[in-house]
Amino acid sequence: MIGQKTLYSFFSPTPTGKRTTRSPEPVPGSGVAAEIGGDAVASPAKKARVEQNEQGSPLSAEQLVRIQRNKAAALLRLAARNVPAGFGESWKQQLCGEFGKPYFVKLMGFVAEERNHHKVYPPPEQVFTWTQMCDIRDVKVVILGQDPYHGPNQAHGLCFSVQRPVPPPPSLENIFKELSTDIDGFVHPGHGDLSGWARQGVLLLNAVLTVRAHQANSHKERGWEQFTDAVVSWLNQNLSGLVFLLWGSYAQKKGSVIDRKRHHVLQTAHPSPLSVHRGFLGCRHFSKANELLQKSGKKPINWKEL
């Protein structure tokens, strides 16, 4: 649409060709600055206002409010144009303020460039699967991961989860092993798709949401961590009685901001084969989470529903 920049226009190369210059003379009575070689020359009307302010006539409170309002509206318009594909509506309403921020615009440009030159997981329509499973206000349990799986057909926007018919990776196998001793009647589902939990209000959130194929942590420190911190912060501040399951030092560090008077936090070792015997097996986090949810008046999770 003419007059509206798209997200990717911020990252397009500067076109080459004839260089045009504008007349140094402002349009009479327009109050619009003319540009000469990139430098703005203020109109007489604008100069008068600037000089007046410099002489000790500050902007009125009403003018300051109007300026702030206009800036906020501009950010919202930019954010609305930058909504990523597949972002759930209720999540968008609460998190859209992030979309117009410079770090997020830069992040989206980086991911787009990566997709142009490399295989990136998960595919664009699945990066935000975690926002499509339930309303943001229906979240009950939060499990924090780190980085998406980087093999073919594995990652689909839910941490620890893999698409069918891909077999469960070792960490997920250990999660199922703990469930089989913690939850009565739990039987290995024969697949690794955890969408059944997500639909019940279990947020399965990685700190970083994309990865280059076969290169673990290749998209770390590009902006995803700041965005997912904003997600955790919103949940922490706006909901109550959530159960956060923090497995391993990385998740525990990311969850250090959680208000433990407002929410419940369960911590143990990561389910990776390297650390599973340091406390994950036998932690009983799944039954404990349900007990805490019931104390908060919430419906427990059916961990067998996969």
Swiss-Prot record:
Impact noted for substituting residue 71 to D: Confers resistance to activity reduction by RPA trimer
Positions marked as site (Essential for recruitment to nuclear foci): 81
GO cellular component: mitochondrion; nucleoplasm; nucleus
Keywords assigned by UniProt, alphabetized: Acetylation, DNA damage, DNA repair, Hydrolase, Mitochondrion, Nucleus, Phosphoprotein
Highest taxon of the lineage: Eukaryota
Residue positions, PTM Phosphoserine: 12, 23, 43, 57
CDD domains noted in UniProt: UDG-F1-like (cd10027)
Residues given in the record as uracil binding sites: 146, 160, 206, 270
Matching InterPro entries: UDG_fam1, Ura-DNA_Glyclase_AS, Uracil-DNA_glycosylase-like, Uracil-DNA_glycosylase-like_sf
Motif mapping: Important for nuclear sorting: 17-19
HAMAP family found in the cross-reference section: UDG
Job description of the protein: Uracil-DNA glycosylase that hydrolyzes the N-glycosidic bond between uracil and deoxyribose in single- and double-stranded DNA (ssDNA and dsDNA) to release a free uracil residue and form an abasic (apurinic/apyrimidinic; AP) site. Excises uracil residues arising as a result of misincorporation of dUMP residues by DNA polymerase during replication or due to spontaneous or enzymatic deamination of cytosine. Mediates error-free base excision repair (BER) of uracil at replication forks.
Name of the protein: Uracil-DNA glycosylase
Organism: Mus musculus (Mouse)
Taxonomic placement: Eukaryota, Metazoa, Chordata, Craniata, Vertebrata
